[in-house]
Amino acid sequence: VTGEATALPPILQAEAQSQKYNLQLDFMKHHFSGMLIVRQMPDNEIRILGSTYFGLSLFDFSLHCDTFIVNSCIEPMRKKKMLKILETDFKNLFLKSEKARIKKKSSTFEQRISGKGFGKTVFTLSGFVNGQAEKVQIKHPLIRLRIQLDKLNINNP
């Protein structure tokens, strides 16, 4: 399925109860692995926290309406362009995506494309359970950035 960019529903649904994902982030020569914790706060703010398994905070972001707030972020990622890319990625993940289009879709996976050239992003969704993707891979081909999210279930910590 291809076509013009249309408003697509969020890839992941933020909820009042914390959702946890295994996080693997590769940026240039840096590799980080840990956990992504996402929670919708009572005022509809979405908190996005990335940390290592040992508790070191990688980043702490807030999405409120269409505003992206950097509460904290480690040095290799604290560059203006990098934060802008992460802002776009997290908005595409948790808010309606206005500029994305579905490139491929089947019963087992979906691929969405957002942006062009330097800002091109490929979202690959798979492992659907009740319409929600259990695995999400975000790739930025031109800047060697890859983010892999695997949902952690209560039964499978």
Give the role of each language-model region.
Residues 2-3, 22-23, 56, 60, ...:
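Mature, soluble, non-transmembrane domains
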